């Protein structure tokens, strides 16, 4: 087997650090899983036996690789990692979408992926410049949810819009916005929630592309964390009865 490098964006593979993310990779993308790395001290830890069983079932090689795990995770307490081939998906045109415009934090993106999956959204788009979807930090923050989602990265928002021209857009921003509780009442069958960069938010032109939405809060805070705002928005739109 070829040696493994510390993660770089130009590699054709990446890592899913952690026992649970590794299991998610094996369960939902077994054809993309190249091998599984396990720490010598992982024996007896919750999930280790199941991870080995899943690897055996998928015909994936399991290796003991303490040094490699420390190198790719940057931590000494990483007990497993799946090595997987990067993949491409297309969002389902009939399903609800979430678009993240220029997100800059891997932890936020991973959290949003996990939240989206948990609330029933399986289609996500990222607009460049943005975090690396396959960075192990993103994969780990998603707790492996990435492997159950259809995620595509676009160079421009216009590219996404041209691919899905018949969708109602809901950019989360203050300009020309209505409260979230009002926006969900007119939710059509096909819709997309759009969230901006952690620091800059969405450019002003997004207000004219759809119905701008705001999450109302009291005056004691000036804004909400991107992951929290996305979670609130996704929850309200998914739980509202059309």
Where are these regions (language model features)?
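N-terminal positively charged helical leader segments and presequences
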Residues: 1-81
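Short acidic-hydrophobic, aromatic-tinged amphipathic segments that line or gate anion-handling sites
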Residues: 16, 61-66, 149-159, 213
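Amphipathic alpha-helical repeat scaffolds
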Residues: 18, 104-112, 223-229
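Structured adenosyl-cofactor binding patch, chiefly the S-adenosyl-L-methionine
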Residues: 23, 28, 82, 117-119, ...
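RNA substrate-binding interface of SAM-dependent RNA methyltransferases
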Residues: 31, 38, 89-176
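Short beta->alpha connector loops at strand-helix junctions that form conserved
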Residues: 65-66, 101, 127-128, 150, ...
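Short, structured interface segments
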Residues: 79-89
């Amino acid at each position: 087997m070829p040696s493994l490098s510390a993660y770089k964006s130009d590699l054709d593979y990446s890592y899913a650090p952690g026992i649970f993310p590794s299991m998610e990779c094996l369960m939902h993308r077994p054809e993309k899983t190249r091998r599984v790395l396990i720490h010598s001290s992982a024996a007896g830890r919750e999930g280790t036996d199941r991870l080995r069983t899943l690897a055996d079932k998928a015909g994936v090689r399991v290796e003991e690789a303490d040094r490699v795990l420390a190198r790719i995770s940057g931590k000494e307490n990483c007990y497993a990692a799946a090595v997987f081939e990067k993949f491409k998906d297309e969002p389902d045109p009939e399903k609800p979408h979430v678009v993240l415009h220029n997100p800059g934090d891997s932890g936020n993106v991973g959290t949003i992926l996990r939240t989206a999956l948990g609330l029933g959204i399986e289609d996500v788009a990222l607009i460049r410049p943005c975090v690396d979807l396959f960075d192990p930090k993103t994969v780990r923050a998603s707790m492996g949810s990435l492997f159950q989602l259809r995620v595509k990265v676009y160079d421009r928002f216009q590219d996404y819009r041209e691919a899905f021209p018949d969708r109602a857009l809901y950019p989360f921003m203050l300009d020309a916005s209505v409260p979230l509780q009002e926006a969900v009442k007119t939710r059509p069958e096909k819709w997309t929630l759009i969230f901006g960069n952690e620091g800059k938010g969405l450019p002003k032109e997004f207000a004219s592309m759809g119905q701008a939405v705001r999450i109302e809060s009291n005056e004691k805070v000036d804004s909400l964390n991107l992951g929290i705002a996305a979670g609130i928005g996704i929850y309200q739109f998914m739980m509202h009865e059309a």
